[in-house]
Amino acid sequence: MTQKMVQDKVVVVTGAGGGIGRDMALALAAAGAKVVVNDIGTSTSGEGQDAGPAQKVVEEIKAAGGQAVANTDSVAEAVAAGRIVQCALDSFGRIDGVVNNAGILRDRFFHKMSLDEWDAVLKVHLYGSYYMSRAAANHFKEQESGTFVHMTSTSGLIGNFGQANYSAAKLGLVALSKSIAL
C-alpha cells in the first residue's frame, strides 16, 4: 500500500479487533490513514461482547504514531451503522473509505439450520455491509469521492458444506458490490 493513496484519509474498518480486519487497520494507519477501528468484541460464533479488542488495536496504532479511535457499534443494525460513520465524522471530520470486514459464523447442515442462525449471518455479512455502505454513501456523493471494500469469499461462488447462510451472504455481497459500483 503506497502512502499517497491513504495519507490523511479517514477509513472505517469493521471487524477490526482481530484477524484480517486488525491487519488492515494497522496497515492503513501505517500508511497514514486515520482509522475507526470497529469491533463489538464477540467471537466468530457471536459469543460475548467486549470493547477490549477494538481498543487494543487503537492502542497499537497510536503506539506506532498513527491516529485511530475505537467504536463498538454493531453493523447488524442500520442505526448503529450510522453511528459508526458518525464516529468517523466526529473524530476526524470526514469519511473516505469503509472496509466491510465484520463477520460471524453459524455453521450447520442446511436441513438443521435454524432461522435465527440464517438471519444472524446475513445480518452481519450482507445487511451489515449494506447498512455501512448506505450510511457512508451520501457523504461520499457530497465530497465526490469514497471507497467501499467488501470482503467476500469463494464460498459465495462455489458454496461450502455447512455454510449455506455464509455462502448466500457472500454471493449477495458480490452483487451488492457490482451494483453500487455502477
Where is each model-derived feature located?
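Substrate-binding pocket helix/loop in short-chain dehydrogenase/reductase
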Residues: I61, F109-F110, E117-D119
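Alpha-helical segment proximal to the catalytic Tyr-Lys
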Residues: N138, L182
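The beta1-alpha1 cofactor-binding region of Rossmann-like NAD(H)/NADP(H)-dependent oxidoreductases
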Residues: T72-Q86, L115
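Residue(s) in the substrate-gating loop at a strand-loop-helix junction
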Residues: S153
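Canonical Rossmann dinucleotide-binding motif of NAD(H)/NADP(H)-dependent dehydrogenases/reductases
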Residues: Q3-V36
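Active-site helix of classical SDR
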Residues: S133, A169, S177
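Active-site loop immediately N-terminal to the catalytic Tyr-X3-Lys motif
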Residues: H111, I158-N165
